[in-house]
Amino acid sequence: MESYQNQSGAQQTHQQLDQFGNPFPATTGAYGTAGGAPAVAEGGGLSGMLHRSGSSSSSSSEDDGLGGRRRKKKGITEKIKEKLPGHHDSNKTSSLGSTTTAYDTGTVHHEKKGMMEKIKEKLPGGHH
């Protein structure tokens, strides 16, 4: 059988493209299709550009309008660290005052012992 593809007598299908280069579906013209071109609404869109607002939350300090600066809001990690016992920043002061009495003068400072030191203490004759 002969193939009529790409020959002068063959019917060629020309694929139509819209304004963005996308192909239209092939239409035969039957059942009331007017011209085969789809209706494209033009105007009022974002035209592919993202628009951002002028506000930003990434700055560490910002102008308060009165010539001063405001401090940055605390993040979640700072809030958690604040609630944990132990190390706190040196610029923070505690509201508890330290009072000493006469019987507090004989305090003994105990060092934390490692596991090997604890085992060595339990061995007989091994107190070095």
From Swiss-Prot:
Gene Ontology CC terms: cytosol
Chain segments carrying region Disordered: 1-128
Alphabetized InterPro entries for the sequence: Dehydrin, Dehydrin_CS
GO biological process: response to abscisic acid; response to cold; response to water deprivation
Biased composition (Basic and acidic residues): 75-91, 107-128
GO molecular function: metal ion binding
Skewed-composition ranges (Polar residues): 1-19, 92-104
Name under which the protein is recorded: Dehydrin Xero 1
Gene: XERO1
